[in-house]
């Protein structure tokens, strides 16, 4: 059989880096791992084709016996469009992934088959059923699959040069019980991991295909610390033997800061960046959302302990908790600045389907709407200690201040000058990237306007004078700022529209509205 597996285009967000990808010569920051994984689960007797809409146009006329579409909640509308387009051409269409697992009813009638849960057992079973004409409308995972039996994803089917990094997975599941999180709903609280030799084979394959960065997409890489340490030792040994050809990134919980051995292993394995869901500097908000692991010790001290091992902390931050009031926005900004966190993915609290938060606010009558999956534009919860208008106005101010030239430059310099050394002297830069980075800087200085020129020259100049060994990281941060600054300007426009709607809802007839939020600078 011929099988086409389609990944929808990502809408713009902090995660997509749309503002700089064209100048970097890339089409997407990294691939969704679902479809290469599914291709790896498909027998060699079948022909599998991958189509990632982030790097190529979708050809609805490709001859295929089965077309599979995956996606998150944020991809829901596009998933339905893709399914309809292929169905109109007589294709047999199936849907899976987080959106299908959390909101299967939204896709009924749009797909011939819906997959709920992980696919290691259900996908091969479906293929057998399809060949005999005995397929079911729904395939649901009953037991969590053993990842040690999972075959290698088909990385070879990806158009690797179009991605900034490749992705692999070590484990699924998380031991914590954060109220807003859908990870434990989908994958459970007991982390399940691949064998170390499986992961190392995937690392070698990514390196063979030309990757210079690998993002390990686990939602909590250290959910099982014993296994995580085993893998980190293997990665460190491999890196040492091969002159550290890959930068590694992943996601962890903040309790990593309490384990010196773990931090030393991350350093030895050449992890340059880790994403941590810090969520809030306010302890009451952390306790409310059951983020108890973030309440141990001082937050800023914990972040700096990670940074002291040469690792950049990217933060996930949220506003809109029940214990948040109108003061939280300045509190968030102050924390991010003092913690020296250059990159913060700051969003609005959302109640995702099937999560404990969703069930609670639904029971309390505070669920405003179903989640659209975009936490950077919408909160579907009625806040407790402020109005929705106050929440949106405050959030709009916060994201503008975060990526203001002065604020970003200050905390980035603070981080670069204080960060611990790295095992391999910083991030890997491909030979072709050196010239490209130079051209980007030249273009930035010529066409970015006087404020961007000042920002770039001062960031690089101070770094070169005070710590020249991290100059290439400073160049990277200067370029990345273009993406975030561009996105926050676009986000401000969408938030203004939402604010205007809320103002109209609460305004007496005939009363004009006023804009109370400071703007995002050009």
Question: What are these model-predicted stretches?
Answer:
Residues 2-5, 12, 47-50, 110, ...:
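Radical SAM enzyme core and accessory elements
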Residues 1-209:
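Acidic, low-complexity intrinsically disordered segments
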Residues 5, 69, 116, 216-218, ...:
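Conserved beta-strand positions
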Residues 106-124, 265-273, 331-346:
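Structural recognition of alpha->loop->beta junctions
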Residues 51-54, 137, 142-153, 312, ...:
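A C-terminal junction/extension of Radical SAM enzymes
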Residues 14-18, 127, 150, 228-229, ...:
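Short aromatic-enriched loop/helix-cap "lid" or pocket-rim segments at secondary-structure transitions
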Residues 10-15, 105-106, 225-226, 284-289, ...:
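Flexible glycine/acidic-rich beta-alpha junction loops that bind and position SAM and/or redox cofactors
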Residues 151-314, 319-321, 325-334, 362:
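Radical SAM [4Fe-4S] cluster-binding motif and immediate context
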């Amino acid at each position: 059989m011929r099988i086409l597996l389609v990944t929808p285009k990502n809408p713009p967000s902090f995660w997509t880096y749309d503002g700089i990808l064209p100048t970097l010569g890339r089409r997407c920051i990294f691939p969704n791992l679902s479809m290469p994984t599914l291709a790896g689960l498909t027998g060699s007797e079948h022909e599998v084709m991958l189509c990632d809409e982030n790097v190529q146009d979708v050809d609805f006329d490709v001859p295929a016996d089965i077309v599979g579409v995956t996606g998150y909640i944020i991809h829901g509308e596009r998933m339905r469009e893709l399914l309809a387009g292929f169905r109109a051409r007589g294709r047999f269409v199936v849907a899976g992934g987080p959106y299908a697992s959390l909101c299967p009813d939204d896709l009924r009638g749009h797909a011939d088959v819906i997959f709920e849960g992980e696919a290691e057992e259900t996908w091969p079973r479906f293929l057998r059923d399809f060949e005999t004409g005995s397929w079911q409308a729904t395939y649901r995972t009953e037991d969590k699959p053993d990842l040690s039996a999972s075959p290698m994803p088909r990385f070879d089917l990806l158009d690797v040069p179009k991605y900034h990094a490749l992705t692999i997975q070590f484990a699924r599941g998380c031991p914590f019980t954060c109220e807003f999180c859908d990870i434990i709903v989908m994958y459970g609280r007991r982390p399940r991991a691949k064998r170390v030799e499986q992961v190392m084979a995937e690392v070698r394959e990514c390196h063979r295909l030309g990757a210079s960065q690998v993002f390990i997409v686990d939602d909590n890489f250290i959910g099982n610390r014993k296994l995580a340490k085993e893998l980190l030792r293997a990665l460190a040994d491999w890196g040492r033997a091969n002159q550290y050809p890959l930068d590694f990134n992943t996601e962890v919980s903040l309790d990593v800061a309490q384990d010196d051995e773990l931090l030393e292993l991350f350093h030895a394995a050449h992890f340059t960046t880790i994403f941590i869901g810090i969520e809030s500097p306010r302890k009451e908000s952390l306790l409310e959302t059951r983020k108890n692991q973030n309440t141990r010790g001082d937050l800023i001290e914990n972040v700096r302990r990670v940074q002291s091992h040469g690792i950049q902390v990217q933060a996930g931050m949220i506003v809109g908790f029940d214990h948040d009031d109108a003061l939280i926005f300045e509190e968030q900004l102050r924390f991010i600045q003092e913690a020296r966190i250059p990159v913060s993915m700051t969003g609005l609290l959302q109640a995702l389907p099937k999560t404990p938060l969703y069930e609670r606010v639904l029971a309390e009558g505070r669920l405003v709407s179903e989640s659209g999956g975009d936490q950077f534009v919408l909160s579907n919860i009625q806040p407790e200690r402020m109005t929705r208008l106050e929440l949106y106005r405050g959030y709009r101010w916060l994201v503008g201040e975060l990526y203001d030239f002065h604020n970003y430059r200050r905390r980035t310099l603070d981080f670069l000058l204080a960060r611990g050394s790295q095992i391999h002297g910083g991030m890997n830069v491909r030979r072709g990237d050196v010239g490209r980075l130079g051209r980007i800087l030249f273009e930035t200085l010529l066409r970015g306007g006087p404020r961007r020129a000042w920002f770039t020259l001062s960031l690089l100049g101070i770094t070169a004078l005070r710590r020249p060994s991290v100059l290439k990281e400073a160049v990277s941060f200067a370029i990345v700022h273009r993406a975030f600054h561009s996105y926050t300007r676009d986000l401000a426009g969408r938030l203004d529209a939402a604010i205007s709607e809320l103002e109209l809802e609460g305004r007496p007839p005939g009363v004009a509205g006023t804009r109370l939020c400071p703007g995002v600078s050009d």
